Amino acid sequence: MLYSLIVNLVDQFGFLNVFKYLTFRTGLAMFTSMFVVLLIGTPFIKFFSARQILNPIRDDGPSDHIIKKIGTPTMGGVLILLGLFSGILLWGDLTNYHIWFLLFIVSSYGSLGAYDDYKKIKFKNSSGISFRFKIISQIVIALVGILGLAHFSQNTELTNLYFPFFKNLIINLGWFFIPFSIFIIVGSSNAVNLTDGLDGLATVPVILVAGCFAFISYVTGNIVFSEYLNIPYLEGMGEVAVFCGSIIGACLGFLWFNAPPAKIFMGDTGSLALGGSLGAIGIITKHEFVLAITGGLFVLEAVSVIVQVISFKLTGKRIFRMAPIHHHFEKKGWSESTVVIRFWIISIILAMIGLATLKLR
């Protein structure tokens, strides 16, 4: 929006040429998103508290959660999305179809999450919408987004699957690209959703993954860097770095209020939207496996739930004291802050490994 206006004035005012630089606009998007969240965060929390938009606590969860977290507002994802939209709409190139694809995914999943949060608040329980309705809705949204992407995309690499550590190992998925992409988006969305169970636990890993993909999208969209790193060059992909910058800024601003002890939770509004957007970014940058590495904490949380459910149905026994796995460690006696910080450390290590795969080929 503002970027488009400024670009038209570059010929008259040469100093405005700096706004054409992706790195500069990524930084602007990040700081804009962060500033918006910090600016409206406190009145937002007060408004939600007054309106009793509070987070329902699981009855079967750790006992201290009932004491510590009851009365904390939820749907903080609205804050994140307002910040994210501010950054990308002001500083992003809105003629880039990748941006519109990502905006569709993040807004649609955010709306679904908001509806889920609304149901939880209205009926004062942690169930929300049914699992079947949520999954079907997520699949439909992802399908519409992928079909739209395939229609408008000029990217000949779109259906290719690349593997980290291998230079020439490429598989063309053909039409299987569609269900594969749906799986990535839906899986990523739910994995972040499952991780968001402790104060700040999901926020920092999202920042780290978005930071990794800001770099990945930048080098993927640069013909010189992509050739040097032997990764596919994707024209226009650099603009995704601006979107990632908006995610980072919005989450940094939100972390100010979400750090232990949290003054607000992101709820499904934030977790579904952020997870879906990370999955979508992994797909369009053609780094799906790197997404699984950098977002390995999300994968671990999701797998712990799947394993727990399968084990209980087949044997009647639970492998973990409670799933997702962060609650398992709480049940073992770890304090919430210990779990959160150690999981952040794991995320930092995984982010470094993920970035290292770009060079180790």
Say what each PLM segment does:
Residues 95-103, 122-137:
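Membrane-interfacial loop-to-helix junctions in multi-pass inner-membrane proteins
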Residues 57-72, 126-137, 326, 331:
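Juxtamembrane helix-capping/reentrant segments at transmembrane boundaries
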Residues 2-43, 82-111, 151-152, 157-161, ...:
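Alpha-helical transmembrane segments
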Residues 69-81, 133-141, 336-346:
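Select subsegments of transmembrane alpha-helices in polytopic membrane proteins
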Residues 57-74, 98, 214, 224-228:
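Alpha-helical transmembrane segments and immediately membrane-proximal extracytoplasmic
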Residues 42-60:
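Membrane-interface helix-loop junction between the first two transmembrane segments
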Residues 109-115, 139-151:
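Mid-bilayer segments of alpha-helical transmembrane spans in multi-pass integral membrane proteins
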Residues 120-130, 163-171:
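Membrane interface segments of multi-pass transport proteins and intramembrane proteases
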